[in-house]
């Protein structure tokens, strides 16, 4: 309360003091502000100077850095150049080393060739020497042969003269008796000829009778053949009409022709080829190709028979060019349709076979195939673009014969491999047998040595066992059967030294030797 009262009493004085203090503070603040601005200007000038100095320093450093970078780049380029030159030098050095090794090998090979050349020259000199010796011997033999030939010619001349003289004598001696001998010889020749003529006459008569009978039989057979021919003609007409109108029968007839070609190819059904095999593709659709021909190395090729006879029959019997051209176009169209349908089957993607990339499309009628190829050669290429090869009975037979030869070669190779394996096994067996025989021979040798030692102990030496046993007989020992006399004699005649060799050989030793 006292303080508040004092404040109220001195209020005006306090306000005056405060106003004076405020003016003083404003003056002080202005002075401080001016001083601060001056210091700030000084600091800014110093900072600007330092910044300018630092910029100069940085520029100098950048210039130095640029110079150093250029020097460093030059050093890198020089280093790369030196490395490249070093690699080139290393490559050249390796090439030189390789050439040195090659030259060394060539030198060794040259030395080897030189040695072989020396050997060949030595052999040549030896052969030339032998040739000269043979030529000398041949010349001597030739001279001797010429001398022998001259002797033979002179002997031949003498024999010729003697033969002429002897022939004259024989001619004079035989002239008197030649007539009698001629008559006898003529009778000897004519009598068998007469008998042969009579026999021939009899054979002619028999043959005439036999031919008459056969002629009658032949007439009968010709009539039967005529009836059979008429029947076959009717059946051929019926078959042609049936084939024209029934696609199933056409297909069956094509399969029959295909079966004949397969039979003539040498391949065996059930071994090298199969017919009417049911297969399915990845989608589960089932297909039944006509024939699957197996190739070596577990490969297969599919043959599908396609019959196109209707248009070809019209082409064959056409009377005008327009009819023939129209039928030919239909025939080509039918073949192309068959090719297109066969290409869509994708036989090479069927499960269960590893087929080749192409299928053989079999055309049973050879003329129909030839007419189509001659009229449109592009038909073959179009078919091959769809992995189809067109074949006729002739070309298919050639292909199948080739496959048969492949199988023959494969079987020969298999047989050769089997023979080699069996030969190897036989050689092993023979080696084991020889080893056993060697062991048996060693055992027999040991047994023979043991036998020789036992026999030496038995019959050699003054105190051998047989001599001592025989002395018991002199002492009155009763025996049931005597020792064989040859052993007793050998024991009595044996030398005094022990282990003397025997004169005779044991039968076992004879067998071993």
Curated annotation (Swiss-Prot):
Residues 36-250 form a coiled coil. It holds the Pfam family RmuC. Residues 490-513 are annotated as: Disordered. One of its GO terms (biological process) is DNA recombination. The keyword Coiled coil applies. Keywords: Coiled coil, DNA recombination. Residues 503-513 have a biased composition (Basic and acidic residues). InterPro entries: DNA_recombination_RmuC. It comes from the Bacteria. Involved in DNA recombination. Belongs to the RmuC family. This is DNA recombination protein RmuC homolog.
């Amino acid at each position: 309360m006292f303080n508040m009262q004092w404040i109220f009493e001195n209020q005006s004085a306090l306000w005056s003091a405060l106003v004076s203090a405020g003016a003083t503070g404003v003056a002080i603040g202005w002075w401080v502000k001016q001083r601060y601005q001056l210091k700030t200007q000084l600091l800014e000038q110093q900072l600007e100077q330092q910044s300018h100095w630092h910029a100069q320093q940085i520029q100098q450093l950048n210039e130095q850095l640029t110079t150093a970078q250029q020097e460093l780049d030059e050093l890198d380029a020089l280093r790369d150049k030196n490395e490249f030159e070093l690699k080139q030098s290393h490559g050249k050095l390796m090439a030189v080393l390789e050439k040195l090794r090659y030259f060394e090998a060539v030198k060794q090979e040259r030395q080897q060739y030189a040695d072989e050349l020396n050997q060949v020259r030595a052999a040549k000199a030896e052969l030339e020497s032998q040739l000269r010796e043979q030529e000398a011997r041949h010349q001597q033999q030739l001279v001797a042969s010429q001398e022998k030939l001259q002797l033979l010619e002179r002997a031949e001349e003498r024999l010729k003269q003697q033969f002429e003289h002897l022939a004259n004598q024989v001619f004079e001696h035989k002239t008197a008796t030649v007539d009698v001998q001629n008559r006898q010889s003529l009778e000897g020749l004519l009598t068998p000829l007469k008998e042969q003529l009579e026999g021939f006459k009899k054979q002619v008569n028999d043959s005439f009778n036999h031919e008459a009978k056969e002629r009658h039989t032949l007439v009968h057979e010709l009539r039967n053949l005529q009836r059979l021919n008429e029947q076959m003609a009717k059946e051929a007409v019926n078959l042609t009409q049936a084939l024209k109108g029934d696609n199933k029968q056409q297909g069956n007839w094509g399969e029959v022709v295909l079966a004949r070609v397969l039979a003539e190819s040498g391949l065996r059904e059930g071994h090298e080829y199969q017919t009417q095999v049911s297969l399915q593709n990845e989608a589960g659709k089932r297909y039944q190709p006509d024939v699957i021909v197996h190739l070596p190395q577990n490969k297969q090729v599919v043959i599908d028979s396609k019959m196109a006879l209707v248009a070809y029959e019209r082409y064959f019997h056409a009377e005008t060019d327009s009819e023939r051209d129209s039928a030919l176009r239909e025939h080509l169209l039918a073949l192309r349709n068959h090719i297109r349908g066969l290409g869509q089957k994708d036989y090479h993607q069927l499960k269960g076979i590893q087929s080749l990339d192409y299928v053989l499309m079999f055309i049973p009628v050879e003329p129909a195939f030839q007419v189509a190829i001659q009229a449109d050669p592009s038909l073959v290429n179009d078919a091959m673009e769809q992995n189809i090869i067109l074949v006729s009975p002739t070309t298919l037979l050639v292909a199948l014969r080739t496959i048969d030869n492949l199988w023959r070669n494969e079987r020969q190779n298999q047989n050769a491999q089997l023979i080699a394996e069996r030969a190897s096994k036989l050689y092993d067996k023979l080696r084991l047998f020889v080893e056993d025989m060697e062991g048996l021979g060693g055992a027999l040798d040991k047994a023979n040595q043991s036998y020789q030692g036992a026999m030496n102990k038995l019959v050699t030496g003054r105190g051998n066992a047989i001599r001592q046993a025989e002395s018991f007989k002199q002492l009155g020992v009763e025996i049931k059967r005597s020792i064989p006399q040859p052993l007793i004699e050998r024991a009595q005649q044996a030398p005094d030294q022990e282990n003397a060799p025997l004169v005779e050989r044991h039968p076992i030793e004879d067998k071993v030797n």
